[in-house]
C-alpha cells in the first residue's frame, strides 16, 4: 500500500461516512498493479478491515478502462455487495461506468458459463479485456467455480483481484491454488506441499515458501486493523492452551448414547456430523438418522422415557431437565442472570436447529414471529425471543438482521438470542452483542476468530467500556477434568484418541493454527509498501476524503483559508489547480458530515465557505424512483 497517502491524514475521524486511510492507500496499490501492470493481486486483509469497500472502489475506477466481473459465494453476500456498492458510489467523487460492472453469485456464474455441466468455451470471449474480483477466494477451489476461474485465466490472460483474510480452511492446499491462479506458471502441488498421514500434517515446504515468494512478489497486500476502539473480550471457563473452554460434563444418559454413536458411526471422527450432533445433544434412536425427512415423519415416537417426537415436534420433560445436553444445561442456567444480546454459533448437521427450537420454547423463550415459550420470560413487558439462522434461510435473513441490529434492540428486547450455523461466519455484521456462545467447535481457529469478528468489530458498539463475554463449550465425559496446557503433551495418537470429541477437535485446531500462522507471517512479510504521490486515477477520491475530514471540524472558514489550500495542494501541487478544485466542490455543494450540523452541503456565503445542514423531506406516497441506466450496477442474482 502507498504509505504516503496514510501520512496525509492526521487524527482521521472514523465515525462518519468515510474511506479509511489504509483503504485509500491500498486502492492506490491496486490501480498501479492490476490496471497499470495487468498483474493479479491477493488482497489478504484480516476480517473487519473493509475489504469489500476497497474492492468496490477499485471496481468503480477500473470500470473506466475495462469490464469488471465480481464473483461472490451466494445470494446473501450478493445482496451485501449490492448495498455496499451504493455506499462506495456515494464516497467515490469521480466518474465511473456502471454498465461495465457485473456482480455474480457463483450459482448464476455457473449457469452463465456451463452447458450440461460442460464449460461453454465459445462464450468465454465475453471476459476478454476484463478484471475479475473474487470474494472469499479461499472458498472457490475444489469445485466447478475454481475450475472455471483457471480456464478463464489461461484462455483470457486477465488479472484477478482475490479477496481473502480469514479463514483459509486448509491453508497450504488453498494457498497453492491461489498461487496457481495468480501466476503465469503451472504449479506442481507435489513439489510445494508436504503431506503426512493426517490433515494436520499438510505443510507448505521450503520449496513452497520460495515459490510463494518468487511468484507472488509484488502481488500481496496484507493488512490487519489495529485493535482499538473495541470492547475487551472476557473468555469464560478453564484455561485451555492459550484460550479458555467451558467443560460441560455429560450426564450418564448423554454419555451412553454419545459412546454408542462414536463406536457405530464414526470412521473419520474429526469430520463426522454425527459427533457434532451428539456433542450438542442426544436424541436416542434419532442419533443414527441422517435424514430430516425421516426424522419429521416419526409419530409419537419415544426417544427417552421423558422425551418424544411427533411429526418433527419434540416434547417432554427432558427438554427442561436437559440430561440430553450438557451444553444446553449450562447455557439455559447461565442466561437467566445475563443481560444483553446473545449470538450462538452451532453446526446444524442433521437436527441441531430442531433441538434448539424445542429446548428454548420449553424453557420459556419465545420464537421470534413464531411460537410462544412455556411460561415465557419477559423483558420490558415483552417475551424474550430467539431466532435460528441456517443455510436454508435466505429471503428473510436481511430483515431479521435489521431487527437484531437496530438501536431499539440494543438491550435484546426485540430479539435477544440469535442462533446461527456457518452461514453467518463471513460477511455479516452484528451489533451490540454482549454474549457469544459456541455450541459447536468450529472447523478452524481462523473460523472461530471469523465468527467472533461478526460481532467484535469497529463501529459495532456504542459503549466499548463494557466487555463482551465469550463461551466456548465442550461436551466432556463425566469424569474428565484434564488440564490442557501444552500441545507437546498430545503428540501421540493413543493419547489423543481417548479424549472427548470436542477436546480432540480443539487440539486439532491448535495444531492447524501453527501452520496457518506461519503462512500468514510470510504473507505479511511479502506485503507491498511504498511511498509515492497518489496515482492520478484516485486523486479525486482521495481529495474527497480529505475534504470530508476537514469540514467535519470546520463549520465556517474564509474562502481563501490557508489550511484548506495547504491540504488540497498536498495532493494537487499546482496552486491554481487547487483553487479551481475548491471552487468546484463549493459550487457543486459537496456533501460532508459536520460535527455541529451533521449532514451538510458546502456553500459560498459572501467571502466564506459554510456548511449548511439539510434534511430530505417528502409528502406521503410521492417517492420518485430514478431508473436511469447509468445509476444501476448491472448484476445477476
Curated annotation (Swiss-Prot):
Top-level EC class: hydrolase
Pfam families: Helicase_C (PF00271), ResIII (PF04851)
One GO CC term, this protein: virion component
EC code(s) of this entry: 3.6.4.-
Keywords: Activator, ATP-binding, DNA-binding, Helicase, Hydrolase, Nucleotide-binding, Transcription, Transcription regulation, Virion
Protein residues bound to ATP: 45-52
SUPFAM superfamilies: P-loop containing nucleoside triphosphate hydrolases
All residue ranges annotated as the Helicase C-terminal domain in the record: 327-507
UniProt effect for mutating residue 462 to A: In strain: Garcia-1966
Matches recorded under InterPro entries: Helicase/UvrB_N, Helicase_ATP-bd, Helicase_C-like, P-loop_NTPase
Domain of life (superkingdom): Viruses
Result, substituting residue 136 to E: In strain: Garcia-1966
UniProt-listed PROSITE patterns: HELICASE_ATP_BIND_1 (PS51192), HELICASE_CTER (PS51194)
GO molecular function: ATP binding; DNA binding; helicase activity; hydrolase activity
Location(s), subcellular: Virion
All residue ranges annotated as the Helicase ATP-binding domain in the record: 32-185
Record motif DEXH box, residues: 135-138
Subunit structure: Heterodimer of a 70 kDa and a 82 kDa subunit. Part of the early transcription complex composed of ETF, RAP94/OPG109, and the DNA-directed RNA polymerase.
Similarity comment text for this entry: Belongs to the helicase family. VETF subfamily.
Protein purpose: Acts with RNA polymerase to initiate transcription from early gene promoters. Is recruited by the RPO-associated protein of 94 kDa RAP94/OPG109 to form the early transcription complex, which also contains the core RNA polymerase. ETF heterodimer binds to early gene promoters.
Protein name: Early transcription factor 70 kDa subunit
Source organism (scientific name): Variola virus
